[in-house]
Amino acid sequence: MEKSRCHAVAHGGGCAGSAKSHKSGGRCGQGRGAGDSHGTRGAGRRYRAASAPHPLAVGAHLRDELAKRSADPRLTDELNDLAGHTLDDL
């Protein structure tokens, strides 16, 4: 394994194998099986996906916010007044 050419090793990942097993001169990410075993390709997508809020968590937040707002009797009365109307009526 040529560590000087392996970007993943420099950042704490492991190389996909020896330099001879790569098809393109020992560079990681370009040989066979290189994308899965070292953590440079795909890892960024996984981390970005994990940092985004889960859709159910967003839904729960919106549900809680709606519950707080609907506890306000003024808002509830306004919504009840509007419930029987269409946009054309307004």
Curated annotation (Swiss-Prot):
Region (Disordered): 1-56
Biased composition (Gly residues): 26-36
Entry keyword set: Toxin-antitoxin system
Function noted in UniProt: Antitoxin component of a possible type II toxin-antitoxin (TA) system. The cognate toxin is VapC8.
Protein name from the UniProt record: Putative antitoxin VapB8
